[in-house]
Amino acid sequence: MTSLLNKLCSLALLFIGCVAAMAQTEKTPAFPGAEGFGRYVTGGRGGKVLHVKNLKDSGYQSLRWCLQQTGAKTIVFDVSGTIHLTSALSIPSNTTIAGQTAPGDGICVADYPCSISGNNVIVRYMRFRLGNKNVKIDGADGWDGFGGFDKQDWIIDHCSVSWSIDECLSVLGNKNTTVQWCLVAQSLVNSGHSKGAHGYGGNWGGSGASFHHNLIVHHTSRTPRLGPRPTTQLDERMDMRNNVIYNFGGNGCYGGEGMKVNIVNNYYKPGPGSPTGDKGKRIAGIGIRTNSYVTTYPAYAPALHLWGKYYVTGNVNSKYPEVNTNNWAYGMYNQIDASGCDGTYTAATKDSIKIDEPIDFIATTTHTAQKAYEKVLDYAGASKSRDTFDALMISDTRNNAATYTGSGLSKGFINSQDDNKPSGAGSDWSAWPTLNSTDAPTDTDGDGMPDDWEDAHGLDKTKSADGNIVTESGYTNLEIYLNSLVADITEQQNADGELLGRTIKVGEEVLTEYEISGQTSNGDWTFAGGLKINQTGSPATGSNGTIKYSGNKKYTITLPVNVPIDQVTIYGYCNSDGNQSYLAELAGKTFGSTDYVFPARNANPSSVTHTIKLDAPVTNTLTFTTGSSNQSCYKINMHIATTTGINSINYTKEKDNYFYNLQGARIMNPTKGLYIQNGKKIVIR
């Protein structure tokens, strides 16, 4: 008995020690230098490695072909140059695009838009230069240069985006995203858009959205537009810091309806095309959703007259020093159109929108605005090998210049990428810079790591499996190689800054529910968290992140194994004017036509939320059936039942003599420290 008690005590102490150690261990970031709300995205970590070996639009080993392969994936490049697309391109869930691997000058995607259509995505060191060559061919209204919306878990790092038909770089309506160290330049004004003049920088927002150390240059407006989406409009939390905004036109930065936003240490530099007077001093022109707006766009009715909260400090305007001494007086308050707020802008409102402490945000290196100006100009965009266009944008910003201007426009703004053609250039001139390629390093096993690098790090260049071995650092061997290619940039860009915000520790975030919505869909009938519905193709989405379900039909949700669900909340409406729908069955229990009713989409209210406690928790699958012949639009949240006690099971396995750190990562060559081996605590001294 004494021996048994000693063993139990030892196990308890080991468990407590492991939990305590885990509580001090930060989750592994996407890569060194990944910051903000998207800091912990995993992308294609642990998945297959795919090589882009040509610059064709499609076909074997093209970028499109690589993106179309199923499963988690990391895409590396064996070639540099410009990929001229013949149709739009989308990036699916669980993908890492490692543009820094391109041998030579890097990769550019041109002619058609590229967007992110899935969850859990990392994109680094890429160029997206759309242009208007196809605006008349395919009716390119609404073509953004890059971005996406209504998904979750992205980080976009060191990308260069230019020449959009609509916005250059729009990322909004998502959960947990970061856009960092990007160069966003020269959206097109009179490019052929059916709505006429555009030339917009981007829409930025989301439920946990970070935008830091980006250069926004030569846009007529939306630099950025602080843009809520219906999916996130009641939980808009955005951190915007250390961005450089040069030669902003029109309304500059504006919007922010109902949002909570940190606007910290940004550098505003009015250029030759910027407005003078109060608009030239603008930090952000904030407002609300008005009666007129929600009448036209009823999906935004939940945020009617909702004022946001803003933490604004440390922002600098290079032309108007009074802004620097009082951000709120000159950059915020005097930018509000009180007459356009349905009479809601009162003295009390004025006091309520200004907050004295920042909203919660995830760890981000923060510089002064002046220091950020230099850092961004030195390192933003696809800066591993800057092309001539990015170099021009940097030069314009440094020198307060507008080298090229389109017909009929203020200085620095263009109608087409061809407006950048130098005088005297030949007929073979192209707006897209030449990107030279060199020979890709030899990679015998195709695991994304060159042979000589594997040799130098004690790996086997004939076995691809070692690329996905997780090291003591929390990164796979492949990730360590990918990160090493730009380690010097990462170190230099963050020097002289202070890491502010909170980090997330291992085990700190406990999942309490699963969501099935347009936002969590992976682009098909699979969803974040390992959920699946027994349908094929892609789900159609309704308003506010809902998914459309046929009437009088039973659906089966496949749940993660052995996770108990005890409560279901359904937000939704009937996708028909003047008609209702209802929930006919859930988890095997049937309901009448008046129990859980969903109103017509044109009713008032036009949606409803029902929370249903299950008679007993269900595991593995959950069924629901729509009632009436009308289509229903649902957002479904499933609460995970809490359990108490410890289930004791008998389990035997072959011995595993590998060492693991407290995050569960297998360690190939352990150094001094605490490890787990065969379930026992091992200390190497």
Give the residues covered by each predicted segment:
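Extracellular beta-rich repeat passengers
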Residues: 234-425
